[in-house]
Amino acid sequence: MHARPDATPSLAAVLGDEGLRLFFPLAALHGALWPFLWTIIYNLGMPADGAMPPSLWHATEMIFGTYGAALIGFITTAIPEWTDRPRPKGRVLFALAASWTVGRVAGLIGDDMLGILGALADCTWLLALVAYVARNWIARPQVRLFAPLFWLSGLAVAGIAVRGAFLLGDVDLAHEAILIAGLVFLGLLGVVLARVTVPVTNLILDPSEATSPYRPHPGRINLAPGLVLAVVLAQIVGVSPAVSGFLLIAAGAAFMDRVAEAFVGREASRPEILALSSSSLLSGAGLILAGTSRLGAPFAETPALHLALMGGLGVGVLSVFAIAGLMHTGRTLPLPRLAVGALVLMVSAVLLRALPELGVLPWLPGPPYALAATIWAAAFLVWLKGYWPYLSSPNKAGGGCGD
């Protein structure tokens, strides 16, 4: 008898093998669909006439929808790698995906009653992530998991507050909780960038991986997240606009300091380093402009926050998609052209969204934000087109998301 060759695994088996394979495409699809729906199909409104303004539904869906799926994929992939413990697979990942998907149903139409189900679903996956990281930290206390656990816990609390405000119909509380959730996500971004940037930069500087020439100053690792935490605490206690404005500027400057760390010689022009530093640049610029707005600058805070949350978080998420999508599918750097093109499209979309309101660019003809939303959607779809063959193919030994 001849030995039967191994059967090709099903698509579900491949996607369920690792968190990023399932959740990065989900995040990309949601990130492409939702802003396009809201700006062009819904015309900045919502199908249902609920208690919450459409803009709050929009912000909630971006933070806990697009970025939330990216977060689930990253945490369920990176934490096992950092702790050298088995990663969640199969049913666990699909259960998280189901919880995340249910949470998105209410956001598609802005219905208050469906919001109850969405609240339960979002709280479920948020708390599950916190419990998962805590369990791994207990099992491997020597691994540096306090910072991710701290910021994840803060995001879970902010998410519960957002959903609670939606259920109560409290617009002011919802607005405040969404802002805090976005800031907490920026703090988490600072932690992730610190973990990801070092191995990526060292791989670029020494592809043989025999040395580690890039060693950022230890004191700078938590500077940006620490100052973002100060902003969050100030927002919670309700300090004056002037005080919170100066704190925002300080946090933005700390992200700018990350950009300075990216100057590692001629390799600083590599797309991978430019992408990661651009995330810090947009985060920093947005926070600084938000702070100056609170100090009386002649523009609103909203476009500045879009630079930080749409730009800093968006480019950071897409950078991780592009880099980890190679490392965890048996490939390596440099980034393929489609990934570079997707990143360029995303930065363009962010600038088209924010700069007209800041008075830097003239308003373009057509529906407000339509072009920015279209280019934003194209960025995610271009990345997905390039990486879907990698993510949907059987697993190969790859690199990683950090040390």
Regions inferred by a protein language model and the residue ranges of each:
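Hydrophobic alpha-helical transmembrane segments of multi-pass integral membrane proteins
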Residues: M1-D403
